[in-house]
């Protein structure tokens, strides 16, 4: 009911761990799959929606254009929950303009980037999120500074930003649940190692490197249920509000 078709991704791909976390989060939240619309672009990550929530709606768009499709679908049907899946190539290169403006619109959706720092479908070239100095499978060293998607989302005013690792299910599942509860644009950047082209010594997106350099900034083991805070005010006026944490 919550799972999808059999994955055709490489054995050990971080994306499959993210798919499993999405299944777990949706099951824990009792989200009905037929009320979910999955949207994606092009890339290994964009194949992933086929591997979870098989009874949901889905649309595989052209490269980098998932946000536009999500915007149109959201305007046409406000009753569905929109889950966008993208990759670092799909978002940080050809889709960068779309990414910027979907944040600007504060579209109500979860936008998840499966970030492996390379183009897995085209033999592992460095993507725009590959760190300077990181080495790929051929030993080539990346000379360019990485685009930090989480920092960029914060700078652009995204109302929910989170970052995690595909190998840390205990953090990722609660983070997904928090993003799904958010009333607005929720962005998740998940480091997801490519076992075929970018899991080698010298890569900063490998399983070993990420595990050695992980640093949790907060615990995500409990997400309290809260009532949505609403108010009304005259144009040009200011009203003080008390948030849940006081």
Task: Show where each model-derived region lies.
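Active-site diphosphate/adenylate-binding microenvironment
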Residues: 2-62
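Flexible, low-complexity linker and terminal segments
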Residues: 4, 194-246
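Short catalytic-loop micro-motif centered on adjacent basic/acidic residues
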Residues: 9-11, 84-86, 160-165
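Structural motif
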Residues: 35-38, 80-83, 108-112, 151, ...
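Thiamine diphosphate
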Residues: 42-119, 171-174
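Short, hinge-like loop/turn segments at secondary-structure boundaries
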Residues: 55-57, 102, 127-131, 179, ...
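Conserved thiamine diphosphate
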Residues: 79, 127-179
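ATP/pyrophosphate-binding catalytic subdomain of soluble kinases
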Residues: 159-213
